[in-house]
Amino acid sequence: MSNSTTGLVKWFNEEKGFGFITQDNGGDDVFVHFRSITSDGFKTLAEGQKVSFEVEQGQKGLQAANVVAL
């Protein structure tokens, strides 16, 4: 279940390294871990930031992969 989509960062906790993304298509919010962010240096996201990502089924529900800030 891997498809590319876009969304906005709902929230992201830099200290814990995770947060959630609200999908533009109205689907369920998607968990995002800092390891899924494709950027150099410190991997973090800002609330309200536009991102593209792939949705995968994780152990505890939907999770984001290959997250790219737009």
Curated annotation (Swiss-Prot):
It comes from Shewanella violacea (strain JCM 10179 / CIP 106290 / LMG 19151 / DSS12). PROSITE patterns: CSD_1, CSD_2. GO terms for molecular function: DNA binding. CDD domains: CSP_CDS (cd04458). One of its GO terms (cellular component) is cytosol. Induction: By cold shock. This is Cold shock-like protein CspG. Pfam families: CSD. It comes from the Bacteria. The lineage of its organism: Bacteria, Pseudomonadati, Pseudomonadota, Gammaproteobacteria, Alteromonadales. InterPro entries: Cold_shock_CspA, CSD, CSD_CS, CSP_DNA-bd, NA-bd_OB-fold. Keywords: Activator, Cytoplasm, DNA-binding, Stress response, Transcription, Transcription regulation. Residues 7-67 form the CSD domain. Its main location: cytoplasm. The gene is cspG. SUPFAM superfamilies: Nucleic acid-binding proteins. It is found in: Cytoplasm.
